Swiss-Prot record:
It comes from Moorella thermoacetica (strain ATCC 39073 / JCM 9320). One of its GO terms (biological process) is oxalate catabolic process. [4Fe-4S] cluster 1 binds at C261, C264, C267, C300. Its EC number is 1.2.7.10. InterPro entries: 4Fe4S_Fe-S-bd, 4Fe4S_Fe_S_CS, OxalOxred_delta, PorD_KorD, Pyrv/ketoisovalerate_OxRed_cat, Pyrv_flavodox_OxRed_cen. Keywords: 4Fe-4S, Iron, Iron-sulfur, Metal-binding, Oxidoreductase, Repeat. This is Oxalate oxidoreductase subunit delta. Transmembrane segments: none annotated. NCBIfam families: OxalOxreddelta, PorD_KorD. Optimum pH is 8.7. Binds 2 [4Fe-4S] clusters per subunit.
Length: 315
């Protein structure tokens, strides 16, 4: 039996929350915990956990947290990932670029994005919406200030409580669009119910036209090996790993003003990822691997570099 067969539970709802490593792990965790705590108050069966198999937990790397909610006992509780999510949540808007956020979604699924941009803009980056039935946007950053705490290390119970930062309004937007739990039960478990209610009230929801689902073709792994130049061998990259493109960790990118640049190459010296090349035209940035750390902008003595939000660019 495949894992997809294990997930054939009609009353099970799967929620996948995408966030950025280290700096946003807690927000993703708070969202899934808030939703499952609210569901538990309604007598439902729940699970909430985080995924550490994507990539090493580094700053800005795409990471996931999961929730499962059902009115029946969850039979597939030992499956580590949500392979067919019903609800996908993006804690940070640039995750819509270069990250397979819609992989495996079920027909009728919902996408919730924390952004101040329009739904039309989000659709431009999505391209094929697949099985999505609705898109939701909520400007959670303007609704609740992030709370800093010294209460403990990563993974510890945080004294600020569930949903103290942007998680509360995002969770409110999820409930508005899906009704997965009662909004009053959600208000009872978040630290900032006012922010949650604002997210619930102000979230923008758009229904999408029906999309004919496309069944994934089942391909034998053995057959794929036989199609390679030499059966049984796996080609390895010579100069770079195409599967490890770190540019999708970026939430902002450096933009250079050539007129202001003095070609001192201080940025080239300080770049921790060797993404800057010295050329006759001045510094050139490799956006395929630039993580948008902002160090080059910080050390530029002439102010020729500016950090610009990643979603301002279509490439």
């Amino acid at each position: 039996m495949s894992t997809k067969d294990l997930f054939a539970e009609p009353n099970l709802k799967q929620i996948t929350v995408w966030a950025r490593g280290v700096v946003m792990n807690k927000d993703a965790r708070d969202i899934v915990v808030a939703l499952t705590e609210a569901a538990a108050k309604e007598g439902k069966y729940v699970q909430a956990w985080e995924n550490y198999v994507d990539l090493p937990d580094r700053i800005y790397v795409p990471v996931r947290a999961y929730a499962r909610i059902s009115s029946d006992p969850i039979e597939s509780k030992y499956i580590y990932e949500n392979e067919t999510p019903d609800i996908v949540v993006l804690v940070e808007e640039s995750l819509i670029k270069g990250v397979p956020i819609l992989k495996g979604i079920r027909p009728g699924s919902t996408l919730v994005v924390n952004t101040k941009r329009s739904i039309d803009t989000i659709l431009e980056f999505l391209g094929d919406t697949g099985n999505l039935a609705q898109i939701v946007t909520v400007d959670a950053n303007s609704m609740a200030e992030a709370v800093m705490t010294l209460s403990g290390a990563e993974g510890a119970t945080d004294a600020t409580g569930i949903g103290a930062g942007i998680a509360a309004p995002i969770a409110g937007a999820v409930v508005k669009a899906t009704g997965i739990v009662d909004v009053e039960n959600l208000a009872a478990v978040v630290k900032n119910p006012a922010a949650m209610r604002r997210g619930y009230a102000e979230a923008q929801v758009r229904q999408l036209p029906p999309h004919e689902a496309v069944e994934e073709a089942a391909v034998s792994a053995t057959e794929l090996l036989r199609q390679m130049p030499f059966a049984g061998t796996v080609p390895s990259p010579v100069t770079e790993n195409e599967g490890m493109v770190t540019g999708n960790w970026r939430i902002q990118r450096p933009i250079i003003d050539r007129e202001a640049c003095t070609e001192c190459y201080t940025c080239w010296i300080y770049c921790p990822d060797s993404c800057i090349t010295r050329t006759e035209e001045g510094p050139v940035f490799n956006m395929k691997y630039c993580k948008g750390c902002g160090l080059c902008t910080a050390v530029c003595p002439s102010g020729a570099l500016t950090n610009v939000p990643e979603l301002d660019f279509k490439d």
